[in-house]
């Protein structure tokens, strides 16, 4: 108990999702089997270890319960999510009202230096002055943005968009080959993703395919979507990327829905789902798309 407390007072636990599939749990028998030797070395019983991961009425070892008991500061990733998490985890503090549960929140943000491209960094260094990246929350820091000549601003954006489209074409070509698709079909899929003519309005949606992120909201009204995507005078390209947790069946169903709509003849080449989502691809998408879709 003293060792757990010593660790807990220096530990912060951030819970990221309300989706049950994102909270791992394992059979107590598995925990006993793999941790029996460690328990003997530490001088604790199997029961003491298992108690750290139990939830009331449960018979499995819950990793979220372990993290809660092994920390003294707990937070969600937005004000609403903090409240939702407090209610979800309320069984761990049955003696405390939900509104008083020790789960607070932080507001998720973006680490600018990680996701901003080197091209934008160089441009901002010239026009916003040295040290701007340390003052991104200071409104006055961004007054210099209006002094950037339009042609320079647009040139950087179009260059990054072309780089992104090169990567999109490469990845779509690879996944098309894995699926034994024809060259003619590939040409139709990539007709709008043209890095030599990056003037098609390109909209990106890339994140985990969890139901509450509403990846399928765009497809609730297909007639409205047709009006947007089937105007030859104003071509639009939607790029989807992301992964679902292996145990999240509804999340996987969302991916299948995106593929289903993308395969409709009228949407061919106008909605692309790019496989193999990772941080490298995320950076390219953030830098290259015209609009970031957030449902």
Label each PLM-derived region with a short phrase.
Residues 1-295:
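Catalytic cores of carbohydrate-active enzymes across secretory and cytosolic contexts
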């Amino acid at each position: 108990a003293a060792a757990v407390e010593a660790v807990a007072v220096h530990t912060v636990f951030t819970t990221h999702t309300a989706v049950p599939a994102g909270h791992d749990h394992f059979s107590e028998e598995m925990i006993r089997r793999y941790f029996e030797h460690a328990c003997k070395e530490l001088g604790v019983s199997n029961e003491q270890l298992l108690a750290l991961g139990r939830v009331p009425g449960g018979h499995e070892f819950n990793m979220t319960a372990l993290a809660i008991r092994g920390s003294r500061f707990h937070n969600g990733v937005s004000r609403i999510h903090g409240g939702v998490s407090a209610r979800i985890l309320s069984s761990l503090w049955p003696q405390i009202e939900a509104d008083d549960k020790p789960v607070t929140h932080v507001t998720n943000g973006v680490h600018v230096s990680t996701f901003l491209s080197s091209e934008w960094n160089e441009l901002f260094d010239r026009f916003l002055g040295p040290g701007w990246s340390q003052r991104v929350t200071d409104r006055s820091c961004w007054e210099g943005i209006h002094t950037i000549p339009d042609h320079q601003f647009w040139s950087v954006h179009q260059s990054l968009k072309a780089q992104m489209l090169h990567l999109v074409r490469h990845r779509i070509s690879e996944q098309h080959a894995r699926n034994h698709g024809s060259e003619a079909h590939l040409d139709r899929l990539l007709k709008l993703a043209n890095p030599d003519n990056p003037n098609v309005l390109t909209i990106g949606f890339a994140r985990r395919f969890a139901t509450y992120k509403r990846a399928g909201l765009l497809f609730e009204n297909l007639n409205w979507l047709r009006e947007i995507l089937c105007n030859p005078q104003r071509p639009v390209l939607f790029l989807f990327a992301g992964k679902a947790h292996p145990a999240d069946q509804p999340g996987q169903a969302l991916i299948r829905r995106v593929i289903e709509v993308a395969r409709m003849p009228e949407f061919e080449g106008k909605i692309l789902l790019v496989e193999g989502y990772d941080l490298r691809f995320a950076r390219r998408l953030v830098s290259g798309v015209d609009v970031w879709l957030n449902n």
